[in-house]
Amino acid sequence: MATLTTTSGDLDVIPEIFLPYMIEKTSEKSEFGASGVIQAMPELQIPPNGGDIVTMPFWQDLTGDDQLLDTSTDLDVAKFTTSVDKAVLHGRALVYGSTDLAAALAGSDPIKALADLYAAKWARAWQKLLIYTLNGAMAVVTDNVLDISGLSGTAAVFDASAFVDANQKMGDCKDKLVAIAMHSAVEALIAKSDQIDYIKDSEGKLLYKEYQGKRVIVDDGMPVSGGVYTTYLFGLGAVGYSEGTPKVPLETSREPLLNGGEEYLISRRHFVLHPRGIKWNPSSGVPAKDVPSNVEVAASGNWAQAYESQNIRIVQFKHRIAAA
C-alpha cells in the first residue's frame, strides 16, 4: 500500500501505521467490543472478490432420543443436517477536513491523535449500526423477547425480578449471558436502588459497571418510544465481526481554493457486524444502494432465524422506567 501525502504535508499519513492502530482502537473504544459481545470470527472472512453476502454453513443440533439396545430390534439412523447463516457486508466511510482535525494535528503526535479520533468516530458509528441491526433482527426471534411494557402499573417497570425473567428467556443457557446494554435513563433507575456494582482496578480507577453480574453497556442510542425502553442482554461473541479491505481504505484529498486550502482525510471500511444465528434475508430491492442503510437493517422483513433460539446469545427486553 503506498504512502499517502498531501501538498502541505498537514495530513501526511502512512496507512501501514495508521490503519492497524485505528482498527485496533475501534474495538477498544466500543463498549460492545471491550465487553466481548463483539468478537472476530474466522468464518466471517470477507471474500477478496467482493459480494454483499457472507455465507456460513453450520451443523444443525442433533435431535431424537437415545435408543435401547435390543437384539431383536434394529437401531434407527438419524441424519446429520446442515443449514446456513448469512451476514451482509457493510461499506461505510468517514470524511473530515483539516479544519475539523485542527486540534489533533496540533498535538505532539498528530498521527496517533488522528487515529484515536477516527477510531472513536468509528466506534460510535458501529454501535449505532449494531442497535439498528438488533432492532430488525431480534423481531424475528420471538422466543428471545420479553415485553412487559404493556402490563399494568409497576409491573411494566424494569426491576430485578423482571430482569431475572429476561434472563430466563435463554432457559438453561442463561449463564452464557454476560452483558446488558441499556439507555442511560435505565441505568439511572437501577443506580437509584443501589444495584450497580462498580468494578475498579487496584488504583481505584473505574473499569466498568455490573448489574447482577453482567457488564453494563450504556448507550443513549438504545431505542425509546412512547415511554417504552428496549434493553439487550448478550452472551460472549453474540455479534460476529470481520474486517475487509476496500480498494482504497485511506486517502487524503485537497481543495486548494476552499477556505484558503482545505485538506480531507477519508477512511473507508468494509466490514461485517452480524448477530450470530440470525441470517440476512433481504426483501426484493434491498439494499437500494450497494450496501444496506441503517433503516434497511432495522426492518424485520430483511431477517430470518437460522439458529435455534437458545443458540442465539441475545435477549431483547422491553419495559418502562415508570408506571404509565
Briefly describe each language-model feature range.
Residues 1-87, 240, 301-324:
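N-terminal "assembly arms/tails" that initiate or stabilize quaternary assembly
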Residues 101-172, 289, 295-308, 318-324:
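Alpha-helical scaffold segments that mediate packing/assembly in large oligomeric complexes
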Residues 139-219:
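Extended, solvent-exposed, turn-rich assembly/linker loops in the middle of proteins
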Residues 4-5, 40, 44, 67-73, ...:
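Signature of extracytoplasmic/envelope-associated structural regions
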Residues 64-67, 106, 189-192, 198-199, ...:
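Short helix/loop capping segments that flank catalytic or ligand/cofactor-binding pockets
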Residues 244-324:
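Extended, compositionally biased alpha-helical segments that mediate assembly or anchoring
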Residues 56, 81-143, 172-181, 254-277:
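Long, contiguous amphipathic alpha-helices that act as assembly "spine/axial" helices in icosahedral shell
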Residues 184-187, 195, 202-264, 269:
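Extended serine/threonine-enriched, polar tracts that run as long, contiguous segments within proteins
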